[in-house]
Amino acid sequence: MRFLITAIICSLCAGCASTPKQAVTSIEIKEIKPRYFETEQFKRISEYMTGKEHVGERLILRTQPEHRAGYYFILVLDEDVRRLPIGTIVVGEFYTPKSLGKQTHEFTLPSLRASTDEIHIGLTGEDWPKIGGVPAAWRFTIKDANGAVLGEKQSYLWSL
């Protein structure tokens, strides 16, 4: 019995002493999937009962959080978003049908994040009033709180 108690205490101490994984210093954006989403595509059954949006295991960042319909870019990363450092910022730059100039939006990742390797970035509300159409070019840069670039990906047309 004494051996069992000692073994349990040792395993608890070892479990508490283990360190969590360190935040990443670089990340690869493996793929970006652009597509248009309607408001209804975000609704779940629980929202009808509670009245609050339930995002589940998704990380969704919008230019206008009160609007859901819009053009989204799903950034697929090579790491879980929880491994990104606190204060991580995603900078999105776009050429859209809305304006001739470049639009730039910064999104700060929340400190509490779902366990996923995808980030949904949405141009919503007035930032994307058209149901049809696609952005001409785009670039995403992921930076830490100090501004150091962790990863970047752009469309082919961005480089022209």
Located regions from the model:
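Contiguous beta-strand segments within globular domains
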Residues: I45-D80, L84-P85, E118-G125
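Sec-dependent bacterial lipoprotein signal peptides
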Residues: M1-C16
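Internal, hydrophobic beta-strand segments that form the core of beta-sheet-rich folds
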Residues: V134-V149
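Short beta-strand elements
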Residues: A148-L160
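Mid-length scaffold segments of soluble, non-membrane domains
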Residues: A69-S111
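Short, solvent-exposed, Trp/other aromatic-anchored flexible loops in extracytoplasmic proteins
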Residues: P110-P135
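Bacterial Sec signal peptide processing site at the extreme N-terminus
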Residues: A14-I32
